[in-house]
Amino acid sequence: GGYYAIRLAAKRPKDVAAIAAYAGHMQDPNAGEPDQLFSVAPEVLKITAPTLYLIGDQDFELRRINIGRAFYALYERGVPVELQTYPLARRAFDFRADATPEEKIAARHARERVKGWLARWVCPKQGR
């Protein structure tokens, strides 16, 4: 998910034009508990790709504190970053078999956000 996207973007920046992460963890899932709670992954500090986070506000598996810290770390370095939170949406709201009406709307909205984000940053002549 999100962590592997940032990991790839940090290791191969010329190969990653933009990131759109649903439910993205911004810390190595194998990192120690203190790191998972109190810091962002070191890779976040190397990212130059525009980054879009899309998360459901009912996704309780995410460490939101890391997403917030990653957002601010990217912003402070001048990396284009946006955070979209979807009210009433649970983890994997974009493809749940048991999606609520709100999650179905959130999934449609998220698809449009991702399409626009990628058009803007991957294909700038067509996306602007």
Tell me what each language-model feature is.
Residues G1-R7:
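Glycine-rich nucleophile elbow surrounding the catalytic serine of serine-hydrolase chemistry
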Residues R7-A17:
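Conserved hydrolase catalytic core segment
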Residues G68, Y75-R128:
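C-terminal catalytic histidine-bearing segment of alpha/beta-hydrolase fold enzymes
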